[in-house]
């Protein structure tokens, strides 16, 4: 027994010594700086820990940094036990891999030291969004408001706040309200039975009000008070009628449930800027909850890639485009360049009625498109060349800015030279940022597809080595050696997206934000 006691005492002393020797966690602007060596220490020390995995070169991360620090300072000032931390994922690759980091920034919330299932951060990238989300995750679904002062403080605390007014907070309606509150991550909720609170906000009976610091200022819920109806009400009213696309608003835009977006590309420098924006807002009021109206400053350098994605040039703006962000992104273009409220409403109504065909971009066909070993495809000649029943056509779908495409270019040119005079093999390429075709949807770059001869309109994805020998084996085998099996296609797409995220951050924007 004595030996056992001695060992226990020694173990305890070692533990105490280890804890005593643990270095204080480094901080930058109130944010903990974590590495693999101190990650466990941070989890043990803080019950609620929000961790940003970032890359130093990432533009989105740089934009987030001041807001992230501001959120940390706000929580500290309030005496909160919640801490914010960050990990340089380019330096701590194993740590990033452990938590499934594939893009930047990735933000995860750890509770009670649990590494097994951290929660993905899903709200916006402004300090208020971060603080609001964390309070929702660590506190009650709705704050109990005992008096008018408490209600006013809550309403002033965030851009959007939802308050339930219930004389009996145990009623069925109040329970439905709380269920809705638990389902919404990024909006603070309050609940009150106080006559003082009812009076302040001019309510004489039970109800729900969404308060916001824009547009109408408040929306009163009407109808049968159920969780689903409340969530639909919130979805329809939580965003401005027109929201400007920025680094900060992107998560709200793409993280929401409204997947149909109409975009106004408008330079802020144009003389009638306010008038055109007002027309857009007037039209927006007719489609709340159905179509999200987004304004993009076409003069801003950060938005040039988005213009390219829609096949627009700065001199063509103002312009309107519509996009659906379902499994396949589909773009639509109005028939008229008229940007009056009536024309915009007409365009949206026709879309909702299914009366508009998708808009497919195409460059003009170069006169010498077939004069080089690698043939140039555009939207206008794609069908004719790729689905030629007498030819086997191997196509690279690329983006001019893609680093992996640039690395592939000399190999693809050599492949073109190799089969330059072949009677039925054609090597081709298409700039998929400027050309779209109905038969093929491209999600990452480069994408390589083989269109074998015959009448079947077959398409084979290439998943082999990107070497001259690998390509030759694939072609000589009739598209068999190196072809992606059906169950490999998802992995192939995942790998490509990972490649994209390793490149310049602006290159990621289209893939991550889907614009």
Swiss-Prot record:
It holds the Pfam family Thioredoxin. PROSITE patterns: ER_TARGET, THIOREDOXIN_1, THIOREDOXIN_2. It catalyses: Catalyzes the rearrangement of -S-S- bonds in proteins. The record marks 59-60, 403-404 as: Contributes to redox potential value. Residues 23-139, 351-480 form the Thioredoxin domain. It is a peripheral membrane protein. Its EC number is 5.3.4.1. Residues 1-22 form the signal peptide. The record marks 125 as: Lowers pKa of C-terminal Cys of first active site. Residues 477-515 are annotated as: Disordered. GO terms for cellular component: endoplasmic reticulum; endoplasmic reticulum lumen; external side of plasma membrane. SUPFAM superfamilies: Thioredoxin-like. The keyword Chaperone applies. One of its GO terms (molecular function) is protein disulfide isomerase activity. It comes from the Eukaryota. Residues 484-507 have a biased composition (Acidic residues). Gene3D superfamilies: Glutaredoxin. A motif (Prevents secretion from ER) lies at residues 512-515. The record marks 466 as: Lowers pKa of C-terminal Cys of second active site. Heterodimer; heterodimerizes with the protein microsomal triglyceride transfer MTTP. Homodimer. Monomers and homotetramers may also occur. Also constitutes the structural subunit of prolyl 4-hydroxylase. Stabilizes this enzyme and retains it in the ER without contributing to the catalytic activity. Binds UBQLN1. This multifunctional protein catalyzes the formation, breakage and rearrangement of disulfide bonds. At the cell surface, seems to act as a reductase that cleaves disulfide bonds of proteins attached to the cell. May therefore cause structural modifications of exofacial proteins. Inside the cell, seems to form/rearrange disulfide bonds of nascent proteins. At high concentrations, functions as a chaperone that inhibits aggregation of misfolded proteins. At low concentrations, facilitates aggregation (anti-chaperone activity). NCBIfam families: ER_PDI_fam, pdi_dom. PANTHER family: PROTEIN DISULFIDE ISOMERASE, PROTEIN DISULFIDE-ISOMERASE. This is Protein disulfide-isomerase. It comes from Gallus gallus (Chicken).
């Amino acid at each position: 027994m004595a030996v056992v006691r001695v060992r226990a005492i020694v173990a305890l002393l070692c533990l105490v010594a280890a804890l005593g020797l643990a270095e204080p966690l480094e901080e930058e602007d109130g944010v903990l700086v974590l590495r693999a060596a101190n990650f466990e220490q941070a989890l043990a020390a803080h019950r609620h820990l929000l961790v940003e995995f970032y890359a130093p070169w990432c533009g989105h991360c740089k934009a987030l940094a001041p807001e992230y620090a501001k959120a940390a300072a706000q929580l500290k000032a309030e005496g909160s036990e919640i801490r914010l931390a960050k990990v340089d994922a380019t330096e701590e690759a194993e740590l990033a891999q452990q938590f499934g980091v594939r893009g930047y920034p990735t933000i995860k919330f750890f509770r009670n030291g649990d590494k097994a299932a951290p929660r993905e951060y899903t709200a916006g990238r402004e300090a208020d969004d971060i603080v609001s989300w964390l309070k929702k995750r660590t506190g009650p679904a709705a704050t109990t408001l005992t008096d008018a002062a408490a209600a006013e403080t809550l309403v002033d605390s965030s851009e959007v706040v939802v308050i339930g007014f219930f004389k009996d907070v145990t009623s069925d309606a109040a329970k439905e309200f709380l269920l809705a509150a638990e389902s919404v991550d990024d909006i603070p909720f309050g609940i009150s039975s106080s006559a003082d609170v009812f009076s302040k906000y001019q309510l004489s009976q039970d109800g729900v009000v969404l308060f916001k610091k824009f547009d109408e200022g408040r929306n009163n819920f009407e109808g049968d008070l159920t969780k689903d109806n409340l969530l639909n009400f919130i979805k329809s009213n939580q965003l401005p009628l027109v929201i400007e696309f920025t680094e900060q608003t992107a998560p709200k835009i793409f993280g929401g449930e409204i997947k149909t977006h109409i975009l106004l590309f408008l330079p802020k420098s144009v003389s009638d800027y306010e008038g055109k924006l007002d027309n857009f807002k007037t039209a927006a009021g007719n489609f709340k909850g159905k179509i999200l109206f987004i304004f993009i400053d076409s003069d801003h350098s950060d938005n040039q890639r988005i213009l390219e994605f829609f096949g627009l040039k700065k001199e063509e703006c103002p312009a309107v485009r519509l996009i659906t962000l379902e499994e396949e992104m589909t773009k639509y273009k109005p028939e008229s360049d008229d940007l009056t409220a009536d024309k915009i409403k007409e365009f949206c109504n026709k879309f909702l009625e299914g009366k508009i065909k998708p808009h497919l971009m195409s460059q003009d066909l170069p006169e010498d498109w077939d004069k080089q070993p690698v043939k140039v495809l555009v939207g206008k000649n794609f069908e004719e060349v790729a689905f030629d029943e007498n030819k086997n056509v191997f196509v690279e779908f690329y983006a001019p800015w893609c680093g992996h495409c640039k690395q592939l270019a000399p190999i693809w040119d050599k492949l073109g030279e190799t089969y330059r005079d072949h009677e039925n093999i054609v090597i081709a390429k298409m700039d998929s940022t400027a050309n779209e075709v109905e038969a093929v949807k491209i999600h990452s770059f480069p994408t390589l597809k083989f269109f074998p001869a015959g009448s079947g309109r077959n398409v084979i994805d290439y998943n082999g080595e990107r070497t001259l020998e690998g390509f030759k084996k694939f072609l000589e085998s009739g598209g068999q050696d190196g072809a992606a099996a059906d169950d490999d296609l998802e992995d192939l797409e995942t790998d490509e997206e990972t490649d994209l995220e390793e490149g310049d951050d602006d290159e990621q924007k289209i893939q991550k934000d889907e614009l």
